[in-house]
């Protein structure tokens, strides 16, 4: 973990990442200054746009880099024929899996923390509080843990790093774009059925994707959008979701959507981590929870 954080590759990634953010921030500040000179007005929304842009870049980075970092963590050891050696040590299997995940999380944490100075520019004119930053970091942390646990799971189950990486990305795409596609299809089918006995206006008000809408609770992109929209947007995700997926009901889940989604995603991550530990366990478990024998996989 320490060696990786001091590598030239890590420094290059930090340099490129922060150079892009700094360039965007400078361009944003320049456009605000030019607008003041021209119209004598300050568009404070541009600072919120900068905050949204930086946060979105971090989210996309977590969504697609974390699976790549973790998908080869266990399968790579198996390919180098060092996994059996690690299994003979006194290290707990849980600690080994969590250590692999933590190593990747630290890399992403360094990138996220390095972007704080650019995000802090929004504090100059207000609109975002420290509580908002904390909520954003919590959302990013859950996304990183979930996508990282997906990579760890496939890395433990599959023998080849290439296959585990592909499966990890397919799962991430299924959680994000897949849940949206399923809900969009269900809403279109419900809308077509409603049009057969109601006017177009009433049909659009009645139709919805039904219970499938709750699949969005496992969608990291929807969770992030809900958080960032509440901080720098309208604060109501229904304005964007209802025209695409139908009416969302008023209940305890929709009222606390962000909390419910983050909790469920953490539970899913824990299940995947537990499954990864089980997958690399050499032998069967006895009633005390310890493995018997040294059955090589």
Region annotations inferred by a language model:
Residues 66-70, 118, 149-150, 276:
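Hydrophobic/aromatic residues in alpha-helical transmembrane segments
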Residues 85-93:
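Short helix-to-coil transition segments within interhelical loops
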Residues 1-60, 128-132, 143-297:
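Transmembrane alpha-helical segments and their membrane-interface loop/helix boundaries
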Residues 16, 102, 106, 110, ...:
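Hydrophobic residues within alpha-helical transmembrane segments
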Residues 58-62, 66, 93-122:
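Selective transmembrane-helix segments that form parts of the transport pathway or gating/packing helices
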Residues 50-76, 80:
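Long, hydrophobic alpha-helical segments
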Residues 74, 86, 121-122, 154, ...:
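Hydrophobic alpha-helical interface/terminus motif in multipass membrane transporters
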Residues 97-100, 125-134:
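Short juxtamembrane and helix-loop transition motifs at transmembrane-helix boundaries
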């Amino acid at each position: 973990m320490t060696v990786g954080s001091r590598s030239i590759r890590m420094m290059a990634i930090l340099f490129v990442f922060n150079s892009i953010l700094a360039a965007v921030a400078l361009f944003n500040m320049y456009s605000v200054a030019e607008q003041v000179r021209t119209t004598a007005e300050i568009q404070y929304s541009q600072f919120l746009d900068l905050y949204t842009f930086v946060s979105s870049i971090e989210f996309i980075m977590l969504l697609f880099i974390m699976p790549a970092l973790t998908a080869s963590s266990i399968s790579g050891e198996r390919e180098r024929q060092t996994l059996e050696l690690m299994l003979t040590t006194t290290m707990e299997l849980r600690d080994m899996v969590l250590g692999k995940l933590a190593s990747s999380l630290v890399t992403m944490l360094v990138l996220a923390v390095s972007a704080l100075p650019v995000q802090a520019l929004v504090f100059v004119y207000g609109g975002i509080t420290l509580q908002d930053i904390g909520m954003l970091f919590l959302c990013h942390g859950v996304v990183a843990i979930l996508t990282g646990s997906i990579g760890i799971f496939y890395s433990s189950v599959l023998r080849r790093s290439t296959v585990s990486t592909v499966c990890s990305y397919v799962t991430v795409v299924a959680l994000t774009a897949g849940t949206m596609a399923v809900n969009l299809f269900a809403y279109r089918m419900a809308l077509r059925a409603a049009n057969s006995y109601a006017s177009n206006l009433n049909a659009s008000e009645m139709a919805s994707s039904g219970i499938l809408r709750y699949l969005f609770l496992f969608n990291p992109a929807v969770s992030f959008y809900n958080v960032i929209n509440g901080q720098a947007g309208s604060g109501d995700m229904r304005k964007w979701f209802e025209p695409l997926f139908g009416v969302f009901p008023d209940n305890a889940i929709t009222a606390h959507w962000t909390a419910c989604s983050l909790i469920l995603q953490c539970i899913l991550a824990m299940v995947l981590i537990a499954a990864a530990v089980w997958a690399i366990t050499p032998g069967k478990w006895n009633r005390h929870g310890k493995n018997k024998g040294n059955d090589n996989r």
